[in-house]
Amino acid sequence: LSSSNPNLQNIPIRNEDGKEIRKAFIPEDGCEFFSADYSQIELRIMAHLSGDKNMIEAFREGDDIHAATAAKVYKIAIEDVTREQRSKAKTANFGIIYGISVFGLAERMNVPRQEAKELIDGYFDTYPQIKEYMDKSIERARANGYIETIFGRKRFLPDINSRNAVVRGYAERNAIN
């Protein structure tokens, strides 16, 4: 699902303009509107697809997934996670499942590459089945020339075996998305 110009799926609620915009939507008589919160849906789907026990456990326990990731990566108690550590973990959580590189993560977080590398390594140490799932997805794409969705749709990736690292990297990121 998507919408644009305007994006009616993401109308602001925390400011006055957003509150006024929302008043314009009125259900027909006998009907009601409902709201669905897809909180961290990408991470929840990745936890399911990969079967990663640590991430599944964090969701089942109702933990703040970004704080839980920070706690595990930085090897501290969840209650000791700082705002900055949580923010970095959040960037890593979403960036990594979309195939961000050490360089890309360092740029996005404005940190040295070594710190970004340590964060990615810590992430995969924490969630090893996610790494395994991503690697196997790329492996299957290389062997077949496509990746298949859970509904059987094939996404062809003609550049997955390219000799050009940049072109191949783009196809590999598409294989895990």
Model regions: which residues?
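Acidic, glycine-rich two-metal-ion catalytic cores of nucleic acid-processing enzymes
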Residues: 1-80, 142-177
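Conserved catalytic core of nucleic-acid polymerases
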Residues: 71-177
